[in-house]
């Protein structure tokens, strides 16, 4: 069983009750309560997450193409980099948004080039950030094909977070294939399309995770930091 952890122990709050045995209990409780509940933001792995200077969270997105291929992504966003354009409330992911899922804002119109300088959330610490993603597809894939899809899915992180894959991050994408739908004779073309969909879904799920997150402690939620009238 593949696994990864999201480090959220230095974000404030009382951690005295988090004894080692509690993590086993958390996993058991999560598996026992699995269902169709689609809560996002401050839930599950997103509860203690932060993203740059904003509260991070749990986000999801999905796509289905005209051929019945379906992709779904779940992201726990605890990134060092920011998901919004510097000086603006728009997400880096805005071109890929569907149905106003993270605010439905118009295209951003920065007056100046995007600045190269990055204002970090600070203080600089050991690598304690990461964005973890799980991507599921209904295609029948071999292990090498699944690996290629996971590689392409990582592009979604690069679209949604700046900077990304930094020395402070441990970004990771897990991909699983349910095997319900076989690829056509145009295998590489199918894989290209599915890989494109995985990247789009990861990108959107990252933005949704931050958009849906609520303020917690000293970390402001996106909609508190950027009220509607700003």
Model-found features: residue ranges?
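A structural signal for small-residue-enriched, beta-sheet-centric alpha/beta enzyme cores
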Residues: 1-230
């Amino acid at each position: 069983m593949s696994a990864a952890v999201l480090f959220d122990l230095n974000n404030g709050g009382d951690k005295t009750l988090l004894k080692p045995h509690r993590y086993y209990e958390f996993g058991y409780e999560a598996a026992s309560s699995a269902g169709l509940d689609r809560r996002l933001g401050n839930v599950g792995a997103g509860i203690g997450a932060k993203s740059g200077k904003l509260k991070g969270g749990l986000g999801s997105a999905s796509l289905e193409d005209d051929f019945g291929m379906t992709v779904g992504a779940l992201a726990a966003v605890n990134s060092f980099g920011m998901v919004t354009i510097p000086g603006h409330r728009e997400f880096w992911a805005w071109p890929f948004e569907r149905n106003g899922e993270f605010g439905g804002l118009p295209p951003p119109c920065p007056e100046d080039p995007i600045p190269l300088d990055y204002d970090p959330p600070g203080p600089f610490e050991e690598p304690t950030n990461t964005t973890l993603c799980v991507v599921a597809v209904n295609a029948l894939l071999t292990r090498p094909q699944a690996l290629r899809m996971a590689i392409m899915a990582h592009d979604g992180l690069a679209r949604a977070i700046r900077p990304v894959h930094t020395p402070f991050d441990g970004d990771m994408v897990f991909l699983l294939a349910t095997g319900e739908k076989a690829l056509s004779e145009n295998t590489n073309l199918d894989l290209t399309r599915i890989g494109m969909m995985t990247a789009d879904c990861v990108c959107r799920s990252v933005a949704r995770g931050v958009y849906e997150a609520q303020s917690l402690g000293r970390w402001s939620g996106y909609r508190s930091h950027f009220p509607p009238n700003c």
